[in-house]
Amino acid sequence: LLVACTDDIAVRTPLEKLLEKRRQCWLIADLSWFEDKRYYSGLNDEICIYPTVNFTDFHDTATLHFSKKFFATYGSEPSRFAFIGYDQGAYVGLSAMAFGPNFVSSLPDATYEGLINSIHIRGGGSAPYNDGIRFVVIYEDTPHLFNQ
């Protein structure tokens, strides 16, 4: 399972090499990775989840708490990648806690309301879709993602 919260080329290149050498892998990454995936053969993958970012509610108490802790720790305001990274880490971590050591097979059943991403996967149509207010996009070329 790979979780990436940046589109920085310094991170993308080593992750691309890892993706090329693996047998099976879930990738949770920024949507901009999908836009460039024609350049990254490892990202032309059958098992990928690409979150999109709609908004961050800066009036929400959890968001304010995260922003204050981030500022106290790093001395700057969190970027959207900080929010994405937090949400993706929490989604994966809470899924592991809820479903146990073999959580990857149950990952699509996890529901998460994050600071910037909401993830609530539903089956239906030709491909699973996310039913969250803010959403994860599962593209039509990955319909068998949840048949694993």
Q: Where are the regions that the model predicts?
A:
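Extracytosolic ligand-binding ectodomains
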Residues: 1-148
